[in-house]
From Swiss-Prot:
Protein's job: Nuclear genome-encoded factor required for the accumulation of photosystem I (PSI). Functions as a PSI biogenesis factor. Cooperates with PYG7 to promote the stable assembly of PSI in the thylakoid membrane. May target primarily the PsaC subunit. Does not seem to be required for the expression of chloroplast genes encoding PSI subunits.
Gene Ontology cellular-component annotations: chloroplast thylakoid membrane; stromal side of plastid thylakoid membrane
Membrane topology annotation: Peripheral membrane protein
PANTHER family, sorted: PHOTOSYSTEM I ASSEMBLY FACTOR PSA3, CHLOROPLASTIC
Record keywords, A-Z: Chloroplast, Membrane, Plastid, Thylakoid, Transit peptide
Transmembrane segments: none
Protein name, as recorded: Photosystem I assembly factor PSA3, chloroplastic
Main location: plastid
Transit peptide limits: 1-37
InterPro entries the UniProt entry points to: PSA3 (IPR037736)
Gene disruption: observed consequences: Pale green phenotype.
Places the protein is found: Plastid, Chloroplast thylakoid membrane
């Protein structure tokens, strides 16, 4: 694959670079964190979480809080894709950003950092609201349609509808471990970015870096285990036998469904 223009290369990685302020003497200080915690995995019973729900429930105060908070999640709101990207960006190191860029170089358009992050967003935020097959069908459509805006809008509508339905039924939200969410993200990334291709050693290395950046609380050992397991299943053909890949015929049918959904959305607007 040919090298991308420098300007485009910077544009791809800029969204994931951490915000850095030069020190007084002009040199950059390395960012340090006391503990690695998943940014979408708060304790719902913590004082901060309870206070957040109370603030979100107040009409005027909640509105102001939502305006001032660019990371979302105020009062239990669903974190949208843009807010999710900002949260990831603030936790990413330069090496994490490079992993996204290198993965894009290897996989081409389907490996676009935004596509990869959409897969992670659907698994991290949509787990418990979206079915696994809904996520995989959506990212398979994205691979051939390249219409990320439509998929984002479609999925956020589905998540909101599922959340409203759960609220009406007064059903508690399922507690899904972050490791399970990371596994779902890996499944989605494979369907979107690989299709049915083999996962090479360099791909495994980059996938580990990406998942560790997005799901830091899962732990490097667990991430390494799930990536190695998936690569082994792909190499042995196990995923095809289990029906966990999307054939070209299904992809074409999904593309037709996508056009139908777009037309319906235009007519209803």
């Amino acid at each position: 694959m040919g090298a991308l223009p420098v300007a485009h290369s910077l544009a791809l990685t800029a969204a994931f670079l951490p915000c850095r302020r030069p020190a007084a003497h002009g040199r950059c200080r390395r960012r340090r964190y006391r503990a690695v915690v998943a940014y979408m995995e708060p304790n719902p019973n913590s004082p901060a979480a309870i206070a957040g729900r109370l603030v979100g429930a107040l009409p005027i105060v909640g509105l102001v809080a939502r305006i001032l908070n660019d990371e979302g999640g105020v009062g239990g709101d669903i974190i949208d894709f843009a807010e999710f990207r900002r949260r990831v960006s603030k936790k990413c190191t330069v090496m994490d950003s490079k992993a996204f860029y290198d993965f894009n170089q290897r996989r081409g358009k389907p490996g676009d950092p935004f596509y990869v992050l959409l897969c992670c967003w659907l698994a991290a935020i949509g787990a418990g609201l979206l079915k696994t097959e809904e996520i995989l069908e959506g990212v398979a459509r994205l691979r051939i349609s390249n219409d990320i805006e439509f998929e984002e809008e479609t999925f956020i509508d589905m998540m909101r509808a599922a959340k409203e339905k759960r609220a009406k039924l007064k059903a508690p939200a399922p507690q899904i471990p972050m490791e399970t969410r990371a596994e779902k993200a890996l499944e989605a990334i494979y369907v979107c970015c690989f299709g049915q291709d083999m996962v090479e050693d360099e791909d495994e290395k980059l996938l580990r870096a990406i998942l560790n950046a997005v799901f830091p609380s899962v732990g490097r050992a667990a991430v390494e285990r799930m990536v190695a397991s998936m690569a082994k299943q792909v190499a042995s053909g196990e995923r095809k036998r289990d029906g966990r890949t999307v054939s070209k015929e299904v992809q074409q049918r999904q593309l037709k469904d996508l056009e139908f959904l777009k037309q319906n959305k235009l007519e209803s607007s």
